[in-house]
Amino acid sequence: MVKKFFITAFVLLSGLAVSAQTLEKMNWFNEPSQWNITNNKLTMSVTPKSDYWRISHYGFTVDDAPFYYAEYGGEFEAKVKVSGDYKARFDQAGMMIRIDHENYIKAGIEYVDGKFNLSTVVTHHTSDWSVITLNKPVDFIWIKAVRRKDAIEIFYSFDDKEYTMMRNAWMEANRPVKVGMMGASPDGNGFNVTFSDFSVKHLPDAVRTEWLEHNK
């Protein structure tokens, strides 16, 4: 009985370790001038006049905002807590899932005309933008992304317990993606943002799981 207990405990602890992401081992794309990692929290000063956007509506393409990421294959659930000192129009921070400069999804909080919005940009050659306006300011938000088959589901939460979907978008299946934390200040002089409790948990491949279920 004791032996069984220790084996079970080891398995549970191992599972937690797999889902946790050590921030020090991640990589920068467009590293900002100031950033710090303390107690597995990332704080950065978002680069002024930086963003991610391709072509549609505005007519320009930019790919120069700070993005701190690790690369993952297969299917997964990723989440992060975001708290920012948003100041200027379009200041934004959240999670990004990226294949390359023409294929990515970014989702989080975006500050527009004095209001806080849950914002998602989906880019496949050209970008689109969807928002959900919040009725009051928030100190922080949780963003969760679930990759299954050829789709990414994006959720938000105010307490890391009850999650609400904000977007379901296509993303090419069976390609490694960069997953991490992003901030942008397209119209401003930058701002400070803190990301905490970032984690990525592997999920069993849905197609393979379905095949195994039907071929027992």
Language-model-detected regions and their locations in the chain:
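Extracellular glycan-recognition regions
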Residues: 21-216
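Bacterial Sec-dependent N-terminal signal peptides
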Residues: 1-22
